[in-house]
Amino acid sequence: ESNEHYYMFLGKSSPFTSGTSGGSDTSPPTPVDDITSENYRYDSMLGLNKIASTDVARVINRRTFVSGTTYDMYEHNISTSNVANNSSATSLFDSTFYFITSEHKVYKVLYNLNSSTGNTQALSSEPTFTSPVKQFVGGYYLQYMYTLSTSEISKFLTTDFMPATTDSTVSSAAASASGDTAPFNGAPIDVFLVTSQGSGYPNGTYYAKVQGDGTGGILKIVVSGNAITYFGESGVSTVQAAGSGY
């Protein structure tokens, strides 16, 4: 409710001992939810601070860019039966599909496979672009997400966590590209996977219309050496027209 207030307090200046509150300083007791314990917490308070809306932020696990690291690519259906393609994470939460750079820019990995071998590859070049247009950097296909503000860095960025925020330009571009003001109702096609290159195909460039719940998607399929090339930046298979509503 609008009239509710939250506070963070400090207390318990004396050591934890088995003869008083139980446990020890290195292994404090598990908090108990009862009236006696609640009263004790109030009695031991030394100071408190009111928490304003600007003192709270949504955070995610911090994943710092390190040159030469192989990151996962984003997949919406990561599970025990479909593990992440590099880290073998079994959930999106544990997948390493994003990272923060030395300039506090955050990027999402849309594709991490080598266009020649189809295997995962390390990312050596630190990206710097801030355009909402997706770009290839060091063989990775990346989406710029946002840059942390000075305030967010000083208040919420730690060794373990980083703020999850929104860049209005990026979100507006995503909504526009989806053809809908609610981008989660559908989106353009950014990436596709070649699960098998096959063999014996006539060399050349071909185009295939994407069948599905969206419209306008067209794939450019390049055959070289009588095999379908993997998705990549240039001279290989790629998305000719992203379409919308998928």
Task: Label every model-predicted segment.
Residues 1-183:
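Tryptophan-rich substrate-binding surfaces of secreted polymer-degrading and adhesive proteins
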